[in-house]
Amino acid sequence: ETWPVFKKFKETVAPNHEHWSTIQSVEYVLRYDVTPYMKRIIHTPTLMVTSAYDDITMTEFEVPAFNKLPTPTKRLVQIGGDASHMSLYDNPDHLNLVGSACANWCRDHL
């Protein structure tokens, strides 16, 4: 699902974009554990935006981890409907929802 989106970006807005994944980079992602660092996010406003049907990232692990953050100022935004991980980037309606959520968060917390 990612290749058509990045191919379109390269053809239309980012001609110098190169999108490479290596076996090593995938292995690093799969081994990464954020848990030891979560306790440091105490007084930091934190926003997490996901799609309801994310088929690329592991939201079944990410959302519970987000919920364990000790900061009282956090917000989880899940874009519903038919939103997928990549549609948050290439579907104008989904992108507007993400942009609005992020702009509101920045207005309130920066």
What residue spans do the PLM features occupy?
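Short beta-strand/loop motif that positions the catalytic acidic residue
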Residues: 41-42, 47-50
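Short, conserved loop/helix-junction motifs that constitute active-site signature segments
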Residues: 39-42, 68-72
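Conserved alpha/beta-hydrolase "acid-adjacent" motif
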Residues: 30-33, 50, 55-61
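Catalytic histidine-centered segment of alpha/beta-hydrolase-like enzymes
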Residues: 82-96
